[in-house]
Amino acid sequence: MLTVTTFVFSPIAENTYILHNESGDCIIVDPGCYFGNERRELSDTISQNGWRPKYLLNTHCHLDHVFGNKFVSETYDLIPHIHEGEKPVLEYAPAAALKWGMPFENYKGPLEFLEEGDLVKLGDDVLKVLFAPGHSPAHICFYCEADGFVMGGDVLFRNSIGRTDLPGGNHDLLIQKIKDVMYVLPDETIVYPGHGEKTTIGYEKRN
């Protein structure tokens, strides 16, 4: 069983997640820790609980979701796992950050690429990669069928959807992917989004 711990980081209020199992192994999803105190909060939480990070996963590579990639990679010797189509977005992130007045040092090491249908395994727990572009060119989500949740990134929010006015965004595609990828999940599936409070598939379909 995977348990979800949530952090809200940076002036952009991005949700960073740690998924841990009973044995203490864990996955870090979308580390958006920008300030030093935020990075300490993340690492202190991990060390105080005795967790062992095994994966660094990015739903997509907009600046607010990768602020902490370099820190997490260096601290825990992890390689970011992304969709290959997000690589240009990752490379552009520092330039985008300057426009936001939030310069940062980007991760520049090796990458592991994930594709639709791939499985990320942590012991007996499994996350399935869902391909849901539209907010960004190659956005992916991570679905845990056994525990009934999906790490949705910036695809679907409570009472809202991801913005599509950023480079690589496509509104019609996002709407289609929400219908074809997200809304086919069970209604009780919990959605952990990149911003704001969690929701469920059923709630969003009704609203």
Predicted segments — roles?
Residues 1-49, 141-152:
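Conserved beta-strand hairpin/beta-sheet module of binuclear metal-dependent hydrolase folds
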Residues 28-30, 55-58, 129-131:
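Short catalytic-loop micro-motif centered on adjacent basic/acidic residues
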Residues 17, 112, 117-118, 140, ...:
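Residue-level detector of beta-strand structural context in well-folded domains
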Residues 7-8, 109-112, 131-133:
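Short Gly/Pro-enriched turn/cap motifs at secondary-structure boundaries
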Residues 7, 19, 117-124:
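Short acidic-hydrophobic surface loop/beta-edge motif
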Residues 33-34, 51, 96, 125-207:
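Metallo-beta-lactamase
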Residues 27, 57, 80, 151, ...:
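Residue-level marker for buried hydrophobic side chains located in beta-strands
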Residues 33-121, 207:
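Active-site HxH/HxHxD metal-binding segment of metal-dependent hydrolases
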